[in-house]
């Protein structure tokens, strides 16, 4: 018998469970750009604004406007941009962005940098929320083995592939990804020989060929093996 494959769609199940427990502020965090050889890592923090009087109507409105939302990696660039515009302007959604440069990535490693980007995203979100002491809030974070001290102090749950399962994490993944892609397109204008507009810094054949031909740029992650190898063995 052929195996049945079930498409997992992000839902509001996790958020609803926490809202029912009394957590009015449920923030979901996700990052974009762990794997690339160049450019920053970005993260987004997303929160759905709720109250007992408008919860049902807001959920119905979100589901209607954002039908088909999923992990950013499973969406076309066009669809990501469409969702980004809806998410960042939706009255029921608050969001913040965090960006950590390639220089800091090289200094503290990519895992720590990704978590720092999440911390920055949460702090930027809090500029809108104005929460003085994080105590009655809850975080849902995509990943495993949280190390960031600021995030660890807040009640949280780590979920592997949360961007595939949790609605607000999928939203965060889209905002983080579109933000980073836009940064890389701007960097392409400064370093056109690498074609960051095409591969966004990821380890593609095109990127490796350009890296081998031109050597690394100031925005390449010098601690990443392909960049390190290129710098140690430049093409003569």
Predicted regions and their residues:
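RNase H-like, Mg2+-dependent phosphodiesterase core
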Residues: 1-54, 59-236
């Amino acid at each position: 018998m052929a195996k049945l494959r079930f498409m997992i769609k992000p839902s509001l199940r996790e958020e609803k469970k926490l809202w029912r427990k009394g957590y009015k502020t449920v923030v979901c965090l996700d990052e974009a750009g762990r794997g690339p050889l160049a450019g920053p890592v970005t993260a987004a923090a997303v929160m759905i604004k709720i109250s007992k009087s408008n919860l049902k109507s807001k959920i119905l409105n979100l589901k209607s406007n954002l039908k088909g939302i999923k992990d950013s990696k499973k969406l076309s660039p066009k669809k990501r941009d469409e969702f980004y515009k809806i998410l960042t302007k939706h009255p029921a959604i608050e969001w913040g962005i965090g960006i950590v440069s390639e220089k800091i990535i090289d200094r503290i490693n990519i895992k720590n940098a990704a978590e720092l980007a999440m911390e920055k995203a949460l702090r930027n979100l809090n500029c809108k929320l104005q929460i003085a002491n994080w105590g009655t809030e809850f975080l849902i974070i995509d990943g495993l083995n949280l190390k960031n001290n600021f995030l660890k102090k807040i009640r949280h749950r780590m979920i592997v592939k949360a961007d595939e399962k949790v609605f607000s994490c999928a939203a965060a993944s889209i905002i983080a990804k579109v933000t980073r892609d836009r940064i890389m397109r701007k960097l392409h204008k400064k370093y056109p020989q690498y074609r960051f507009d095409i591969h966004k810094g990821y380890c593609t054949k095109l990127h490796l060929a350009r890296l081998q031909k031109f050597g690394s740029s100031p925005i390449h992650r010098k601690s990443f093996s392909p960049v390190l190898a290129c710098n140690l063995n430049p093409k003569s």
